[in-house]
Amino acid sequence: MNLIGKWKVKELPVYPEPGKMIFVAVEDFPKYITDEDLLNDYMQQASFIYEFCEDGTVETMMPIPEEMMEKAKEQGAKIKDNYGVIDTTVWKEEDGKLFYDTKINGTVMDEPVSSFAEIKEAEDGTIRFNAGFTVLERE
């Protein structure tokens, strides 16, 4: 699979009741999320764009409102197509599988574990990112 390019959020997990998680399409959030503040948080996360670059990096980008653009530039924000880059990490292909660096380091039974998590592709061409909690589709 070729990851290069921009990906947008298609689905995020929603918890309609304690202990139950379902993935919900962005346009259906209001059906499942009734708290206005929580809905705003979800909509903000759903506006992120993820760009997988040929140099092996993936940039998480958030839209910058036009009235905030100059201030963001003055503060040194990296701006691409009216989006501010809020995180950059690396991705790689290894043994035919795709991985990205979660930047989470740790150990299991005193042995270090990799900070890389697999990016899984679904039959419909979407991918699971952010430890599987974000479903992305090509922009």
Annotate each language-model stretch with its function:
Residues 1-139:
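Lipid interaction determinants
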